[in-house]
Amino acid sequence: MLRRGILRCFSILFVLCLLALVAGGAFLYLTPAGRVDRGTTYILVSPGAKYKDVEQQLQNKLWLRFPSAFRYLAQWKGLTSAPLRSGRYAIPRGATMPEVIEILQTAEQVPLTITPTALRTEDELITFLTSNLWLRADSLRTLLRDSSFMARYGATSETFRAEVLRQPFTIAWDATGKTLLDSLHSGYLRFWKG
């Protein structure tokens, strides 16, 4: 009789512990990953970035509530071992930890809309573009000074700067220099074709 009572007590205790673990896991799984007082947060993943860099950025921008739980879930889902895709990712307000991990693993990056100001010199143009995009200034300068590359636009380095209008254009944050110049040129052509 006493043995049966002890067994029943242990089974009830086991069920209660199991329920507490399930409730705690559900709480962590369904609770927003970061502060909910902010709107959309943008995470910038540079080419070749490691998980630690992204985790630090998430902590700084999103203020992860449970960083160690997020790290374990990211390891379990394979975010820490797989190479990260570069880009600019939008984390919506109130996103849970699994949603943040899914965005970083599978989502398309959010394009960036840039409106150039009055850019008169090559240095002003390069500084403006490289401050908004993940692009090295020396690679963009090399493309702008390459006369054979500029010939594909029917322009020179000096005349191409005139194609950078004060019109907003949309481009991926991690675009290459060629993609950027193609986008600027197509925006110029669209503007003049009406």
Indicate where each model-derived feature is located:
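Conserved catalytic or metal-liganding residues and their short signature motifs at active sites
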Residues: L2-G194
